[in-house]
């Protein structure tokens, strides 16, 4: 991935370097997922893995981090759109109507607009990197509880991923554009098998 046009603030770069050398936790709070954020996270994880002689894992982890972070941000955007359109996340019919609206609205420009709305609403995505020589924990979460319907869909995706032998099989059998496609879960499962 090439470096983004917009540079990161120097304070963020310095904090990441300090974290890398002290093996402390790094927490990144974002309201969307733009190219500068992606570049920063991929570069940081590459440096962490290089430090512990595991650079071969960097491309796969970079994809997984991007997939899960984008899904967490999209969940926030979806909730904002639902609120704007008076959609009840607990009502299955209303939820399906909201998902149709969301699929129609999702775009790069929508992501920029809703990233600003997410910031105004204090809906963020925290990506935490916690590591030392023995382990690497990456936690990606938004600050919005899932509805019962959303949780059920996530659990179905986990079950589908567990039944598939590889990413290609999963993609052919389980393409579902209503939420995230479930690729992050499948990427993680595949990485666990191959490490």
What are these regions (language model features)?
Residues 2-9, 21-50, 54, 189:
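N-terminal assembly/transducer modules of large multi-domain enzymes
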Residues 6-26, 74-195:
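Conserved beta-strand-loop-beta-strand hairpin that lines the nucleotide-binding pocket
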Residues 41-66, 88-93, 170-179:
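Conserved short strand/loop->alpha-helix "switch" segment adjacent to the catalytic nucleotide/phosphoryl-transfer site
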């Amino acid at each position: 991935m090439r470096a983004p046009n917009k540079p990161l603030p120097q304070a963020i770069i310095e904090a990441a370097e300090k974290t890398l050398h002290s093996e402390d936790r790094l927490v990144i709070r974002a309201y969307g997922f733009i190219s500068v954020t992606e570049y920063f996270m991929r570069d940081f994880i590459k440096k962490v893995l290089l430090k512990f002689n595991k650079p071969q894992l960097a491309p796969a982890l970079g994809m997984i981090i991007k997939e899960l972070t984008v899904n967490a941000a999209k969940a926030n955007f979806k909730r904002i759109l639902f609120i704007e359109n008076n959609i009840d996340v607990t009502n299955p019919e209303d939820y399906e109507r909201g998902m149709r609206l969301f699929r129609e609205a999702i775009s790069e420009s929508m992501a920029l607009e809703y990233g600003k709305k997410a910031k105004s609403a204090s809906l963020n995505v925290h990506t935490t990197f916690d590591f030392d020589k023995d382990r690497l924990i990456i936690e990606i979460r938004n600050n919005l509880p899932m509805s019962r319907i959303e949780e059920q869909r996530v659990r179905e995706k986990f079950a589908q991923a567990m039944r598939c032998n590889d990413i290609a099989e999963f993609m052919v059998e389980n393409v579902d554009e209503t939420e995230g496609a479930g690729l992050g879960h499948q990427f993680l499962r595949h990485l666990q098998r191959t490490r």
